[in-house]
UniProtKB/Swiss-Prot annotation:
Family: Belongs to the herpesviridae inner tegument protein family.
Pfam families, per the entry: Herpes_U30 (PF04523)
Record's protein name: Inner tegument protein
Organism: Epstein-Barr virus (strain B95-8) (HHV-4)
Acidic residues: bias regions: 1127-1136
One GO term of the biological process aspect: virion assembly
Amino acid sequence: MASAMESDSSGGSGGADAQPPLAEVDGGLARVTRQLLLSGDDPAARLRALMPLELGIFGLGDLAQPVLVRDFLNTLTLMSGHAYPAAVLRHHAYYLLRAASFSRRSFGLGHLEAALDVLASSLPPTTASPATDDPLDGSRLIAETRALAAAYRRIIEEGSGEVLAVSGPTATFAFVEELVADTYLARWDAFPREGLSFYAFNAAKTTLGRWLVTVYAETNRYPWAAAGQGQPTAADIKAMAVELVEHSGGGAGGGEGEESGGGLFHRPESLSSVVASLPLARRRAVEILGVYAEASGGQTPPVAAVPVLAFDAARLRLLEPSGALFYDYVYEALLWDQTYGVPDSVIEAFLAGMAAEMEALAARVQEAAGSRASFSPAAIEQVATVLLSAGLNETVAGDYAMMLASVPRVSRSRWRWLEATAALLESLSGFALHFFRLLPTASPTSRFARVARAAYLRAEAEAVDRRARRTSGPSTPAAAPAATAVGVGAAADPWDAVTPLRIFIVPPPAAEYEQVAGDLSSELLRSLLWVRYSRLWQAPAPAPALPCKPPLLPGEQGRRQWTAAVAAAPRTDVEAYCRSLRAGQTARADPAYVHSPFFPAAFIEFQIWPALRRVLSNELPKTRSLAALRWLVSFGSDLALPSPELTRARRPLELIYATVWEIYDGAPPMPGESPQAVGLRPLNLEGEGKAGDAGAEGAEDEEGGGPWGLSSHDAVLRIMDAVREVSGIISETISASERAAEAPPLAWPTSLFSLLFTLRYSTTAESLGLATRRFLVSGETLSEDISRLTGAAWRLCSRPLLYDAETGRVQIPLATEEEEEAVVAVKEKSVSSSPRHYSTDLQTLKSVVEGIQDVCRDAAARWALATADTATLRRRLLVPALRESRGIADHPLWAHTSEPLRPDLEELNERVEHALELGYSLTGALRRSVAYRFRDYTFARLFQPPAIDAERAEAIVRRDARPPPVFIPAPRRLPQGGADTPPPLSMDDILYLGKSICKALVDVLDHHPAAPETTPIKTYTPAMDLNPEQITVTPRSPSVLAAFARTARVQTHHLVPALTDDSPSPVGQTPPPFRILPAKKLAAILLGNGRNASKRRASRDLSPPPHGRWRAVLDSSPFSFSSSDFSDQDEGEGGEADLRGVPGGGGEGAYEEDRERPSDIDTAARAQKVETSCPRRRSPRTTPSPSRRASGGGGPDRGEAEAHTYPPYLSAAAAASRVRPRTRRGATRRPPRPTAEDE
């Protein structure tokens, strides 16, 4: 038998849970004929020879060869003395046509017509005309098949969308199922035949809204309904693209001036990685710019140079809710925290409208599906029309599923209604994916019935996972009010996305099989028919029609008949004969004993019970176990008297045999399945098929729905059900015997169940276990890599940065040697008396900030995708196995077993679920880290456009213009104190960021940039008796402050001490770092620094000293900024609390004293006084060592003063030489970088 199921060399390879691919019956009719000739008089051997035709299929081309058909029928004629072969021979036309298949794509309708001619010639002359009373008459079946072939040819040629309707015995033919599937395939390929009403197009208020609908409809070639505005022409599409680019786009360049949200196209505010670079928004922009380039005669720009499609508050208000599923670029941006300056109130109003519209769409889907619980092509078309009209097809659903899987779930809680909208998108896209994957092959066939059932169960598992994720995930308090505000319940209980899929569930054709079974003369043939039915349709067979016992003659004649039967074979002799039989070895039955009325009970008690015990105990090898089961089914079946008990016992034994064979050797292929072609295509009407013209796209490889005819998902459960049925029959037989009191209790071993379950799911468990281990290892690696990056980001933003406005240099505080060596120094203030700084330029700092966020977000996106893939793998591989294992554990058969079987898949499921919890936790931790929003939030002000430019600054100083009304809200002050305050950056962190994020950070920058060239813009002559005044500005100044300084220095020679605005900031609130002051005060402050102001740094070490002694200086200085000015608490995230400030000390008197002194008027002596008046704890030295003093001109006194006034910093070369190697695991590991190959 195993050799009959050899794999086809041309077959593909399955997945991790796939068994070897199976060909059709090797050799077809020729091999079956040879096996029949070798079987002789052994009924078990005959059963083994015919089993491939009973349960499998063979190529239709074999029936077109008269020699093969003749040899097969002649072999059956030699065995016509036995009931089983005689029944096959009597209905050979039905028997052969039932298993014939088009699955080898070289077969077509020409081969079918030739096969029908051969079968017609094989019929006896007496049955040349159809018999009206025999549904299995050969002539009648051939005539019906010819009519079906003609109808199929007409349907395919006309292409009218009509489908083939079949009833009667021909519905059980394998090739007829394939013809039906082909007509349905042609119908779905042409769908939709009628135009779709894109109501979002007519309701759109903007050109962008109409453009999105037009691109969707034209890309997918959907027909437009005649009503409404009609289908846009090519000229209309080009005109829309031109309008979007030239009139509302603000220029396709997306330059710096558009960051405020004025244009339709923007550069992403921060994202530059592959996964997290807003791919949907970029694709939308590519579509618009591509048509625009075609309309304007230009070339389409490369994708890397194209900005993303963005939005502003005005455009967001104009987006109609009816097009909710067309705004994927908006949802994508919001989930990645890209708002383009749109207020939260506008975003929440938009999301509320979209959530309400999507819930209405879900209700329309439910209404279209109705309450139908079985296959309904009309309902399928209605649901498809609703989804396609709303803008949701398989591609769009896949994009939404990928987007939602790649974004951390905690991102959904930032705005009210975002969680509700994302939940509805998730359920709608998941339903649409299942729906449109089932749609192309939907047909009332056995293969699709298995696929649809598997998809339905998978959808149920996904719904359970979604509910579990919502209940166990992070709380979203904003989602609950959002759900109840206008009656939208998506956040709490999204719509039922599983029940509508019932319109794909195909009911089995039980009536047709009943009609066939009623006309079969062999009980064995009838039982095997129902085994085939159970396997094809994964449905339980109805209870067998029990034969009636031969009636005894009445009165004295009946007693004589009974006496004669008992005398011919007494009960004891029959029992002794049954005891002497050897299961699987005794070939011929003795009619004298088999005809006895005592034979059924004795055979059940002395053969079926002990033989089945040996099979279930796994004491026999595989071949002997199968042989024993075949023998129990076939022994004496042709000779024994009709017996209800024996018939009831042999039906489940046949099912056990077929299922065990299925698990051991793999099931033979079923209708519609082929190792060469997955999926169905219309057949070649001329008889020349196209081999392999369909790829694996859309193929289902799960739960017995794949192309290789794998064992069904509940194979072990079916065996247990059959054993339980046999148990009941054995118990009845034993209880009716005379030895009922002496019989041992009925108990079954479980070794075979354990073995079969292991064979069924060992590959699945091993694959999933390996995938889980790899997932955990990759998570550990990612944690080690990304933790160093997030830690460096945390330390970078935990200390104020020093900025030199003159040179554009930034000084990053570094940890002292004591801080690097003492780990416990973090819990208390441990600041060395000689702080170190690392110098870099402002552009490099911006690149570092951007790179940190990009790497963190890319890692979060890729890890979220990996977690989603692992969850999908669990649903696909483990959930079906769990269903069966739980059914096994709760099976009532264990009441009659010695040791209940407890499959260990629950432990594997716990490990996988624990791994997924860790994956979700890591994704949430990345999302809450400060690095995730490093550019968008912490250092956002670095990337904002300047408040004023140099020209306007000069005009303000010259009193030619009023100060602009630009006031930046003051950020929250960093929390002071705390045990978790991180130390400053170390040089290891600097080198790490330089190697992995921005190489320019560690480049040698010993030279200073040359002084910018100045250009005179106005000269006053002595004609008015005034001294000439040279007013110069810098064409490309490092900052606006430099322009202020240079212009004011030549304007004013006297100063009035002034420090703050007329309305100082409230106590406890940090004023804005760039404060717009009146021109007089600004000029006075700038000139108060003296003529050497241009040589002095405009910013000093403004780290918050003890208690606010320098608070006035910090609050009033318009030149300095620190990372505290850029950071804020991440609302609702709970992850930004790791930003800490540097608390200080001091008294109120010092504060009052400093209020009357300009912020930048200072001397080295006062700086030294301040330093000594505020001693720092845990500092072993009060003066820096000579090697750590600031370099520069001046005498010893000035150098010593400068050493106190300006903190020293290291150059890149010096920093590299002072780094000590680290041996911590993963210290030199680079974090994941975004690459083009990332998925």
